[in-house]
Amino acid sequence: MAVGGAELKGLVRLGWCAGYGALNTLGLYRGSAPPVAYVTEKANWSIQWDARSYVGAIEARHPGTVTVTHRPQSLIGRVVHFGSQFHWGQWSRALSASNRTIVTYYHGKPADGPEMARHVDYFLANMKRLSGVVTASRMVERRLLDWGVPRAQLARVPLGVDTTHFRPPNADQRLVARAKWGVPPDVLCIGSFQKDGVGWGPGLEPKLIKGPDVFVAAVARLARDFPVFVLLTGPARGYVIKGLESHGVPFRHVFFDDYRDIVGCYHALDLYLMTSREEGGPKAVLESMASGVPLVATRTGMAEDVVEDGVNAYLAPVDNVETIVARAQSLLSDGASDFTTRGRITAEAYDWSIVSEVLYDTVYRELLA
């Protein structure tokens, strides 16, 4: 019987882990400190940058505690924290039983599609392999509890934002940013900084849980009443790009090797729209608030936790283009200085230095005792 690609990769992972385990048994390999390993994929995107942010802040207060790696096969006798439940699913059968494993579960429910339904079933059936589960939002925390994840095994640790890096621009910084990205001076610049296409290619097939169709529809409606320019970042944005082109909405798409360079894009914005149907965060909610950018977000992920509707930003029901547009029109027409001032105060409570200590205190400390 032929072995499929997924099965072959699984066998390779088993072989890698078994090899390191055998070397450890023979006394030829002991692994390396520190005691906690935060595992990410190699892709230069959100999960990797989340890991760097958590780990950097923890190491600043608790040196020698945790490191970032994309090589779980070499981990023996460690606390192993997978930053994505999907990545853990690929390695769960192969990992050394000497490890204590934690998984961050950001988002996903069976209704999101057959593949996600299979993933959820596998995750719940293999809880015995885990020492803990982390999630970022109250929404997903409630969901996991409803599915039977034990309260004692679950911790809610919000995503964070570097409030010293993401700050409101002064007038000169704003002018420089808009000139750099080709934003005309007389337009209203709307931002969308995410990955919303399937895979890592052009992204012409939409990842619908990220709401790219909702974003395009909302922007097209706003463009009837305002001179709109869209600034996009992130990989796999082809679906959104084609949609904007079809509606004649001008845009610029940029991608950064260093994610932190995205701060200059926030400096160019008049509005940020987060139109997802399902989210774990996203970080853009806090980054917008920290950067003084007015925000309209759908009621999903951490947006429900950090947005006080009509106070520091606006919330809209998932899939409700009409409400998204109405809230955006209000911010663009009436001004948003009070919103952005309150949003900045909100973001400061989620600085990485604060949320990383939650991760250390509620998850790592007990496992390291």
Q: Residue spans of the language-model regions?
A:
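Carbohydrate-associated surface elements
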Residues: 139, 160
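Conserved acidic donor-binding segment of nucleotide-sugar-dependent glycosyltransferases
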Residues: 309-310, 314-320, 330-335
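Short hydrophobic beta-strand element within catalytic cores of glycosyltransferases
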Residues: 294-297, 307
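Short alpha-helical donor nucleotide-sugar binding micro-motif in glycosyltransferases
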Residues: 264-269
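Nucleotide-activated donor-binding/catalytic signature segment of Leloir-type glycosyltransferases, i.e.
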Residues: 234, 238-260
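A charged, aromatic-enriched C-terminal amphipathic alpha-helix characteristic of glycosyltransferases
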Residues: 337-365
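Conserved catalytic-core segment of nucleotide-activated headgroup transferases in glycan assembly
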Residues: 179-180, 185-239
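Aromatic "clamp/platform" in nucleotide-sugar-dependent glycosyltransferases that forms part
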Residues: 277
